[in-house]
């Protein structure tokens, strides 16, 4: 039997993986998460992000340490054609102001606080400086305070099962291989950080090259 062509978008790669592999995908502290759960949860989140008005080409910033919510958001963005802007959780006012202005982030996912930095205060104030920033999503059980620019959203509420869990995403969300998927910033050691854009095609090519180099297998 001829082998199937390699997936050319991250969403397609995830769908293929779900069909072929049923083991643990990620371990988050003491929680083992299978590929099927990653797919279902990211699809649910993708629908909720669409309901917020996010779609193809929109920038979604992620300011988180290593935790599973990062990956759920990454895959959800990939499914609706949005672009993830990865922001280091150690960045503070100066760096974040520059990157928010540069990348035109429309929604951002962050902890309420981290290492003594109050993200609720910073981000709610940032909405006045950056008109593109419409949605604040916080990884916490409590939503951010209601402010004139709009309330923050407790991220866990976007992951909760609901009546739209079987709804198909509209065709206009479907990403193409050369659509932008991810923006990361250089360290800026000799000047201001520079944005590096990564497409679906280049992200998958990089992953395959790394797997081949390290002799990584499905097990």
Predicted regions span which residues?
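Conserved ATP-dependent adenylate/AMP-binding module captured primarily in the ANL superfamily
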Residues: 91-126, 206-219
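ANL superfamily adenylate-forming
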Residues: 114-177
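Conserved S/T- and glycine-rich ATP-binding loop of Class I adenylate-forming
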Residues: 60, 77, 180, 186-189
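AMP-dependent adenylate-forming
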Residues: 12-34, 139-146
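Conserved pre-ATP/AMP-binding loop-to-beta segment of ANL
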Residues: 7, 22, 143, 151-153, ...
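Conserved AMP-binding/adenylate-forming core of the ANL superfamily
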Residues: 2, 6, 24-67, 71-75, ...
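Structured binding elements
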Residues: 81
């Amino acid at each position: 039997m001829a082998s199937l062509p390699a997936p050319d978008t991250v969403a397609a790669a995830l769908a293929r993986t779900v069909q072929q592999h049923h083991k643990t995908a990620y371990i988050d502290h003491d929680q083992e998460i299978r590929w099927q759960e990653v797919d279902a949860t990211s699809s649910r989140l993708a629908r909720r992000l669409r309901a917020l008005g996010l779609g193809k080409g929109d920038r979604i910033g992620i300011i988180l340490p290593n935790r599973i919510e990062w990956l759920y958001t990454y895959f959800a963005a990939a499914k609706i054609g949005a672009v993830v802007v990865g922001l280091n959780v150690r960045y503070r006012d100066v760096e974040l102001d520059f990157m928010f202005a540069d990348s035109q982030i429309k929604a951002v996912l962050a902890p309420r606080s981290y290492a003594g930095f109050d993200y609720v205060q910073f981000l709610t104030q940032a909405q006045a400086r950056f008109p593109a920033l419409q949605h604040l999503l916080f990884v916490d059980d409590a939503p951010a305070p209601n402010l004139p620019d709009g309330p923050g959203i407790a991220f866990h509420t976007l992951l909760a099962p609901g009546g739209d869990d079987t709804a198909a995403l509209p065709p206009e969300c479907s990403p193409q291989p050369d659509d932008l998927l991810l923006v990361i910033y250089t360290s800026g050691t000799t000047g201001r950080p520079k944005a590096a854009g990564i497409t679906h095609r280049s992200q998958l090519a990089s992953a395959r090259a790394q797997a081949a180099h390290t002799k990584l297998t499905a097990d």
